[in-house]
């Protein structure tokens, strides 16, 4: 079985969230998921799927290989769909279940100045969608930005520019 991990580097955790250790990560996870799932806020066993840290980590994992250009149907800047799709009005997107139970992650590949792969983004190119909503999402680093090395023994990993949550 192969997996995909979306990894936030230590310096990003520190700069954006003040997280420098596991206890800081536990607190951040609790601040997100204890409010969303208040009945589970007292679950301290980190192997329990209801634990906030377990939810946080498992939301950053897919139970499949997800290469940069296969998480949406854009297989590069010159792909047929990228050229023929009305990308001025719609971003190309796809959804996947994560390892966090009952959760989805949206991947989109906008064009224009915001081009690249994003997680949980809403909008078109670098602006709001037709309903007036824009959520920038979390950018996935390209394999080239990672030095071309993102394989692991049991899957692959991608660096991302911020945490993601459900």
What does each model-identified segment do?
Residues 1-166:
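Mature exported/compartmentalized surface modules and terminal targeting/interaction regions
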């Amino acid at each position: 079985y192969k997996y995909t991990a979306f990894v936030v580097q230590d310096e990003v955790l520190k700069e954006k969230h003040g997280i420098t250790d596991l206890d800081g990560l536990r607190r951040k996870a609790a601040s997100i998921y204890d409010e969303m799932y208040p009945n589970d806020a007292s679950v301290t066993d980190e192997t329990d799927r209801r634990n906030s840290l377990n939810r946080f980590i498992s939301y950053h994992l897919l139970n499949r290989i997800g290469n940069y250009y296969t998480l949406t149907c854009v297989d590069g800047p010159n792909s047929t769909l990228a050229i023929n799709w009305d990308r001025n009005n719609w971003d190309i997107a796809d959804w996947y279940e994560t390892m966090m139970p009952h959760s989805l992650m949206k991947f989109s590949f906008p064009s224009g100045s915001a081009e690249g792969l994003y997680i949980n983004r809403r909008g078109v190119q670098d602006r709001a969608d037709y309903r007036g909503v824009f959520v920038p999402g979390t950018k996935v680093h390209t394999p080239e930005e990672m030095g071309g090395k993102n394989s692991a023994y049991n899957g692959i990993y991608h660096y991302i520019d911020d945490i993601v949550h459900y």
